[in-house]
């Protein structure tokens, strides 16, 4: 007798072992038809999996996130099947699920073209319509390796030969195609109805640039066509908002090969940067932080003491001078500890909050670099709080409040919060971790925030809160962190004199709100599609004269506004006014101030707001008041 407990708590009993598919059928024909897999005691399995013991089971359908993963994984195999049918000489390698889709890497003697992708996708649709059953068999490692060697699939054979000999190997087959995979997969190809191939890119075998270059075909797959259409629309919108494209269009920044992963900021881009930095400086100053500046290059001995030299050296830029080894800092924390240590600290000095817009460098792989989003040289809005155990909850509450307020000011309303908990390998006692984790929970609760817990995802030196902001396209970006550190103060000898005159280690909180300034500016540009809020815009207004006779008034008006703190310029070029309006509209300037003879004579201005909204003619003072109203909450 086999007892199966279902998600609703009910128990079904069977006189003999049953498959997941048979359990689904016993519940109802609709569920049997919809079943894509099962979750057996928490493990994702195929519908053909036999259950021969008492267990809990959830039937997985396309309404579940796991069901969508199964569909995408199976579609990757369908892609490989189609490629092998159309291009038999192509060799298959790996094909995993990724965010919003999948990819498969192939070795082939020529590049795949867009026309090839159309043929492959058409063949995939034909194979899916055949509704061929997907079967699984378990074989020994040697048998699997021998099979793939015999059909000329050397990459698959190499993967298998790297697996321990005692491990069982799962092979999945549909039609004339067999692939190596852990599974699970859909019961038949007919379940794969909504998919699209997206692009081809280069990739290296096993991710090693010393190995052969492969071709990676990316695709997306969904349960409903509406979901796919929505995703494709989002991609189109994301392409329009691409910060690299807008950076060029709006003349904000550029990057070039002579300095990979470093940014050349243009005047308008640097004006935007300054608005963000000055705003953040005001906020941390108001929150009781002390701004400091630490060296960019420090001796190897400090990095050895902190542990970075041993654990992070391959990501650090190093140099040598007068027979001493140095590293350009990849992070600011060791330098902040040095400032804390400079002089004897008392419990009366705590909490101490040190902030720095610290310039850091990390030797990221060239292939991973991506505009402002992944760079080698970056500035962090970094801060470290040194406090007592009794103070860290209050400090965490204050930081949560500050971070949420900052994100709202920048236009981000939806923040997902994740709490990473203790890993298996960790420093400190269970009691210390209990206090640390519960303290962060209490701080989040006190702020009325909800969060997702990630067991085992914390750093070895302490638990961490992550703040993921959602942009206008629904994409999630991790920006902020609050990391409790139980190790670095001890490694670097930070201590304070407690009330009983004993020496104690401070609790150290690493914290950032925007994280990398470069990356955050990239996110901001895409979130606002380049149309920055008035308080952030590089130029808040441009004064445009219609003819030469108004040039002096236009220039005087710009100077008057400038003295009142408005970021403004005058465009006095001898061009048609329609041309100038169009040009500055494309530059997404919030306000265009047009002056003709009437405006000059009346000392007024014709105001056009972004989006072509005509606000009419008004006195200069009225425009300034309107602008100040826009800015009031950020002063």
From Swiss-Prot:
Any one biological process term the GO annotation gives: threonyl-tRNA aminoacylation
Residue ranges of every copy of the TGS domain listed in the record: 1-61
GO cellular component: cytosol
InterPro entries: aa-tRNA-synt_IIb, aa-tRNA-synth_II, aa-tRNA-synth_II/BPL/LPL, Anticodon-bd, Anticodon-bd_dom_sf, Beta-grasp_dom_sf, TGS, TGS-like
Keywords: Aminoacyl-tRNA synthetase, ATP-binding, Cytoplasm, Ligase, Metal-binding, Nucleotide-binding, Protein biosynthesis, RNA-binding, tRNA-binding, Zinc
Cofactor: binding details: Binds 1 zinc ion per subunit.
Taxonomy, superkingdom: Bacteria
CC cofactor: Zn(2+)
EC number: 6.1.1.3
NCBIfam families reported for this sequence: thrS
Family per record: Belongs to the class-II aminoacyl-tRNA synthetase family.
Job description of the protein: Catalyzes the attachment of threonine to tRNA(Thr) in a two-step reaction: L-threonine is first activated by ATP to form Thr-AMP and then transferred to the acceptor end of tRNA(Thr). Also edits incorrectly charged L-seryl-tRNA(Thr).
Protein name, per record: Threonine--tRNA ligase
The species this protein was found in: Burkholderia vietnamiensis (strain G4 / LMG 22486)
């Amino acid at each position: 007798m086999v007892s199966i407990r279902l998600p609703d708590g009910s128990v079904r009993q069977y006189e003999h072992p049953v498959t997941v598919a048979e359990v689904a059928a016993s519940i109802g024909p609709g569920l049997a038809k919809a079943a894509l897999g099962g979750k057996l005691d928490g493990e994702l399995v195929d519908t053909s999996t036999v259950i021969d013991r008492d267990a809990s089971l959830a039937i997985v359908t396309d309404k579940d996130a796991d069901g969508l993963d199964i569909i995408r994984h199976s579609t990757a195999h369908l892609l490989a099947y189609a490629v092998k049918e159309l291009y038999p000489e192509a060799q298959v390698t790996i094909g995993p699920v990724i965010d919003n889709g999948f990819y498969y890497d192939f070795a082939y003697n020529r590049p795949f073209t867009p026309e090839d992708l159309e043929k492959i996708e058409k063949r995939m649709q034909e194979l899916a319509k055949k509704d061929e059953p997907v079967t699984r068999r378990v074989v020994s490692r040697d048998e699997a390796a021998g099979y793939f060697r015999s059909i000329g699939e050397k990459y698959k054979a190499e993967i298998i030969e790297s697996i321990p000999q005692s491990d069982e190997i799962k092979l999945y087959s549909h039609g004339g195609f067999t692939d190596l995979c852990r599974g699970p997969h859909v019961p038949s190809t007919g379940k794969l109805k909504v998919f699209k191939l997206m692009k081809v890119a280069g990739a290296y075998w096993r991710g090693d640039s010393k190995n052969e270059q492969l071709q990676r075909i990316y695709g997306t797959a969904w349960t409903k066509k509406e979901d796919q259409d929505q995703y494709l629309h989002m991609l189109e919108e994301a392409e329009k908002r691409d910060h690299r494209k807008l950076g060029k269009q709006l003349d904000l920044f550029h990057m070039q090969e002579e300095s990979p992963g470093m940014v050349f900021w243009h005047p308008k881009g640097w004006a935007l940067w300054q608005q963000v930095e000055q705003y953040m400086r005001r906020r941390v100053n108001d929150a009781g932080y002390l701004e400091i500046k630490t060296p960019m290059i420090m001796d190897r001995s400090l990095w050895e003491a902190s542990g970075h030299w041993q654990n992070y050296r391959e990501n650090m830029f190093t140099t040598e001078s007068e027979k001493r080894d140095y590293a350009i800092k990849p992070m600011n924390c060791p330098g902040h500890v040095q400032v804390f240590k400079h002089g004897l600290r008392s419990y009366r000095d705590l909490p101490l909050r040190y902030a720095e817009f610290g310039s850091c460098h990390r030797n990221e792989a060239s292939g991973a670099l991506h505009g402002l989003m992944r760079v080698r040289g970056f500035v962090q809005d970094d801060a470290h709080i040194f406090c007592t155990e009794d103070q860290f909850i209050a400090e965490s509450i204050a930081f949560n409040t500050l971070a949420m307020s900052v994100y709202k000011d920048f236009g981000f309303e939806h923040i997902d919060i994740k709490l990473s908990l203790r890993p298996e390998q960790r420093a400190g006692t269970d009691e210390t971790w209990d206090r640390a984790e519960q303290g962060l929970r209490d701080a989040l609760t006190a702020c009325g925030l909800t969060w997702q817990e990630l067991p085992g995802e914390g750093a070895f030196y302490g638990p961490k809160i992550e703040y993921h902001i959602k942009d206008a396209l629904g994409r999630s970006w991790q920006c902020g962190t609050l990391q409790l550190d139980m190790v670095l103060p001890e490694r670097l000898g930070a201590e304070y004199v407690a009330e009983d005159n004993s020496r104690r280690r401070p609790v150290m909180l690493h914290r950032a709100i925007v994280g990398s300034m470069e990356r955050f500016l990239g996110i901001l540009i895409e979130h606002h599609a380049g149309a920055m809020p008035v308080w952030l815009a590089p130029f808040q207004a441009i004064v445009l004269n219609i003819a030469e006779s108004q040039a002096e008034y236009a220039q005087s008006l710009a100077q008057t506004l400038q003295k009142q703190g408005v970021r403004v310029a005058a465009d006095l070029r001898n061009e048609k006014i329609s041309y100038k309006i169009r040009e500055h509209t494309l530059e997404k300037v919030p306000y265009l101030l047009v002056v003709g003879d009437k405006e000059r004579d009346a000392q007024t201005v014709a105001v056009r707001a972004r989006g072509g909204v005509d606000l009419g003619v008004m006195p200069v003072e009225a425009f300034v008041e309107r602008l100040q109203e826009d800015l009031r909450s950020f002063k």
